[in-house]
C-alpha cells in the first residue's frame, strides 16, 4: 500500500476481473483511480475499439499514462472529491463498463457525500457509522454507468464481512443486481496480506434472489461456484465462510436423523387469547431467555396440544422472531399455531439447542426462512437442520 492507500493490481487479477465481465461490445470504459493502468491494459486487450476514460490523483503519473497509452484519456483529479464524477466531462449514465481498484482509506467529514449517495439511489449509505474511500469510488462509478452497465470493483474484506458495513451490503442487494463475488487470495497484492474481493454488479434492479460466490487462486484459477441467497449475503459475502458452512452441513447429522419429531400448534393466537388457558406464542420469546419454566398444569383435554419438559419451542413464522427457540425446563404449556414443538431424545437436547443458537445455526435458519413480509420456516426444511456439533460417523 502506498501513501495514498493504494494497492496496485497485478496482471493476473486484472485479467481475472476483465474476463468475468459479461458485456461483449462496450463503447465506453471507465477506470477511476487508474494507478499503474493494469486493469485498463487488460480491458484493452479484450476491447481495443472501446473509448477509455480514467482519473489519477498524481499529475506526473496521469501524464505518463497518457503518453504511454495513447488510447486512454486521463483526468488528473482527486476522485475522493464529491464532485469528481462531474469533472470527467463524461455524460452521467453513458459508461458501459467501470473497472476499479480503489484506494482503501477512512474518509473524514462523511456529510459532504450525502448528495452523491442520494444521486445514485444509495442514500442509506449516509447511515453508515464510517465511510471509506471504496464507497466513494463505488458511488462515482454508479453515477457514470448507464442503466444495466457493469461495474467490477475490488474491495476490502471489511466491506464484505464487517458488521459496520451491513447497510452497504443491504443497499446494493436492494438497489442493484449483484451477480458474482470472487474472493481473492490473501497475498495477491505486493507487500500486504490484506484480504480482498471482486464485486460484479449491474446498475439495474435485480430479479434474482441468489448470487454466485467463487474463490480464486494466486494464478487466477476459479473454484466451483456456490449459490447463496441474497438475504444471507447481507450479513457477509465471503466465499470461504459459506463454503465452510456447506461442508459442515454435509458432515452433520440432521434433526430427522436423530429421531426428532416436529409438531405445529393447533390454535391461533386469537383463539388462545380468548380462552382462559395459559399459552405460548411468538410474542413470548422476547420476554424469556433460552430456557423457560411453566408452573401450571394443563387439562387432559388439551394434552395433545401441549409442549412438555424437554421440548424445544421454535417460532416458525414472523419477521423478526422467526427461528427463535426456547427449551422447556419444567411444566407444560399449550402452544399456538405460530410455534413448532420439537421433541428429540434426551441425549440430543442440549446439542440441538446449542446448534440452533450457534452462528452457523442462525445462518442456516435465516437462509431457509422464506416469504416477503412474514417469513416462514417449513417443517420439511427444519427436518434437515444439521446439528453442527454432531458429525456423521
What residues fall within each predicted segment?
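A short beta-sheet element
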Residues: 303-305, 312-357
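Conserved Class I SAM-dependent methyltransferase catalytic core
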Residues: 38, 61, 127-185, 198
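Non-catalytic DNA-recognition/assembly elements of restriction-modification systems
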Residues: 99, 222-268, 384-393
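A short glycine-rich beta-alpha junction/loop motif
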Residues: 333-340, 371-393
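Class I S-adenosyl-L-methionine
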Residues: 1-68, 72, 83, 161, ...
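Sequence-specific dsDNA recognition surfaces
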Residues: 119, 255-266, 283-309
Amino acid at each position: 500500500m502506498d501513501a495514498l492507500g493504494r494497492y496496485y493490481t497485478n496482471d493476473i487479477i486484472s485479467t481475472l476481473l476483465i474476463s468475468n465481465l459479461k458485456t461483449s461490445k462496450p463503447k465506453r470504459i471507465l477506470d477511476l483511480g487508474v494507478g499503474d493502468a493494469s486493469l485498463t491494459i487488460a480491458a484493452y486487450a479484450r476491447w481495443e475499439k472501446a473509448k477509455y476514460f480514467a482519473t489519477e490523483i498524481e499529475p506526473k503519473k496521469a501524464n505518463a499514462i497518457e503518453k504511454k497509452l495513447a488510447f486512454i484519456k486521463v483526468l488528473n483529479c482527486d476522485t475522493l472529491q464529491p464532485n469528481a464524477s462531474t469533472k470527467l466531462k463524461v455524460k452521467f449514465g453513458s459508461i458501459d463498463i467501470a473497472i476499479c481498484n480503489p484506494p482503501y482509506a477512512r474518509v473524514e467529514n462523511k456529510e459532504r457525500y450525502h448528495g452523491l449517495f442520494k444521486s445514485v439511489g444509495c442514500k442509506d449509505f449516509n447511515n453508515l457509522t464510517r465511510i471509506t474511500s471504496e464507497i466513494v469510488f463505488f458511488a462515482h462509478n454508479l453515477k457514470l454507468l448507464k442503466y444495466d452497465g457493469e461495474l467490477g470493483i475490488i474491495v476490502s474484506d471489511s466491506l464484505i464481512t464487517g458488521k459496520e458495513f451491513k447497510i452497504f451490503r443491504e443497499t446494493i442487494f436492494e438497489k442493484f443486481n449483484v451477480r458474482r463475488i470472487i474472493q481473492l487470495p490473501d497475498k495477491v497484492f505486493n507487500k500486504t496480506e490484506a484480504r480482498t474481493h471482486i464485486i460484479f454488479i449491474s446498475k439495474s434492479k435485480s430479479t434474482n434472489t441468489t448470487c454466485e460466490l467463487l474463490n480464486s487462486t494466486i494464478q487466477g484459477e476459479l473454484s466451483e461456484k456456490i449459490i447463496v441467497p441474497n438475504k444471507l449475503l447481507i450479513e457477509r459475502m465471503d466465499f470461504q465462510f459459506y463454503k465452510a458452512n456447506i461442508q459442515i452441513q454435509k458432515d452433520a447429522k440432521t434433526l430427522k436423523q436423530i429421531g426428532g419429531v416436529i409438531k405445529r400448534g393447533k390454535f391461533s393466537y386469537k383463539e388462545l387469547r380468548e380462552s382462559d388457558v395459559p399459552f405460548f406464542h411468538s410474542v413470548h420469546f422476547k420476554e424469556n431467555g433460552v430456557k423457560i419454566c411453566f408452573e401450571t398444569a394443563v387439562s387432559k383435554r388439551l394434552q395433545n396440544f401441549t409442549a412438555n419438559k424437554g421440548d424445544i419451542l421454535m417460532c416458525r413464522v414472523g419477521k423478526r422472531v422467526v427461528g427463535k427457540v426456547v427449551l422447556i425446563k419444567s411444566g407444560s404449556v399449550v402452544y399456538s399455531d405460530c410455534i413448532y414443538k420439537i421433541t428429540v431424545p434426551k441425549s440430543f437436547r442440549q446439542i440441538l439447542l446449542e446448534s440452533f443458537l450457534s452462528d452457523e445455526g442462525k445462518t442456516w435458519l435465516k437462509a431457509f426462512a422464506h416469504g416477503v413480509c412474514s417469513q416462514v420456516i417449513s417443517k420439511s426444511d427444519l427436518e434437515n437442520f444439521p446439528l453442527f456439533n454432531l458429525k456423521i460417523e
